[in-house]
Swiss-Prot record:
Protein name, per record: Uncharacterized protein CXorf38
Gene: CXorf38
Keyword annotations of the record: Methylation, Phosphoprotein
Organism: Homo sapiens
Modification sites for Omega-N-methylarginine: 61
InterPro entries: DUF4559
Residue positions, PTM Phosphothreonine: 314
Superkingdom of origin: Eukaryota
GO annotation, cellular component aspect: mitochondrion
Lineage: Eukaryota, Metazoa, Chordata, Craniata, Vertebrata
Record-linked Pfam families: DUF4559
Length: 319
């Protein structure tokens, strides 16, 4: 029975905390999307006003030679070279890693979002707008682009919490951790007191983190789901959808780490096995993640075969 599996999972307080923290990140993502979308357009307009020569009439002459790869980008035309300089001028981390591989430089003169992706983490080349991004992508943009006037320490604290959620091998966090997370995410939200949709989420997050989800196995005349002591109601399917989104994001994180060989093969294998064991015990979640798991298994198998080729060595962990 699907609900009994959900009840068993949420009977573990630390797993419930993990889901609640993840739900907060989903709420944060939803309230930032519109704001970020508007600000990216404003930022792009400002760039073009300051440097009209970079506008729609500017055309990349380098073609495929102006295609970036991961953190490497050596423009082969004047337009892309000037755009790169302009982006770096506004990049807080201009001397560090910039994920140029997210971008299509030929679109920079006409597409604000292609510019925004230069300020974001790796793996976002196919994202067409803020509505397709997770919370950490939007937070990283806010943190890395000097167009956003915020206390960057507050942004990095939330990013750090998000990474701890995604990197939690057993998908569990303590109640002490959750209280600390609540303080940090609310400190961040306080930076946007003039943005109505962000202000509206503040109380929802506070209510979520201070309430206790209780899962009930319903009788015939009762509704399925979770009911908080403060009266907020989440149906079983809503809770399940939150879990699915968090697990998909976690698997995507593992995939990117595997693709860029950021962790040792044994560590990667251990992380993957923990998720597989969890899904073996939770069929309701496993069925919706089959494609994600197959994609990850295929990459890991391919890398394993590559490492076994004569003369090939497993790369050292990246710094």
């Amino acid at each position: 029975m699907v609900l009994s599996e959900l009840a068993a999972r949420l009977n573990c307080a630390e797993y419930k905390n993990w889901v609640k923290a993840g739900h907060c990140l989903l709420l944060l993502r939803s309230c930032l999307q519109g704001f970020v979308g508007r600000e990216v357009l404003s930022f792009h307009r400002g760039l073009l006003a300051a440097a009209p020569g970079l506008g729609p009439r500017a055309v990349c002459r380098g073609g495929s030679r102006c295609s970036p790869r991961a953190r490497q980008f050596q423009p082969q035309c004047q337009v892309c070279a000037e755009w790169k300089r302009e982006i770096l001028r506004h990049h807080v981390n201009r001397n560090g890693d910039v994920h140029w591989g997210n971008c299509r430089p030929g679109r920079w003169p006409v597409d604000a979002w292609e510019v925004a992706k230069a300020f974001m983490p790796r793996g976002l080349a196919d994202k067409q707008g803020p509505e397709e991004c997770d919370a950490v992508a939007l937070l990283s943009l806010i943190n890395s682009c000097d167009h956003f006037v915020v206390d960057r320490k507050k942004v990095t604290e939330v990013i750090k919490c998000r990474n701890e959620i995604m990197h939690s091998s057993e998908m569990k966090v303590s109640s002490t951790w959750l209280r600390d997370f609540q303080m940090k995410i609310q400190n961040f939200l306080n930076e946007f007191k003039n943005i109505p949709e962000i202000v509206a989420v503040y109380s929802r997050i506070e209510q979520l983190l201070t309430s206790d989800w209780a899962v009930h196995i319903p009788e015939e005349d009762q509704r399925d789901g979770c009911e908080c002591e403060m009266g907020t109601y989440l149906s079983e399917s809503q809770v399940n959808e939150i879990e699915m989104q968090l697990l998909k994001e976690k698997l995507q994180e593992i995939y990117l780490q595997a693709e860029e060989q950021e962790v040792l093969p044994e560590e990667l294998s251990n992380r993957l096995e923990v998720v597989k064991e969890f899904l073996r015990n939770n069929e309701d979640l496993r069925n919706g993640l089959t494609e994600d798991m197959q994609k990850l298994d295929s990459l890991c198998l391919h890398q394993k075969l590559d490492s076994q080729e004569p003369g090939r060595q497993t790369p050292d962990r990246k710094a």
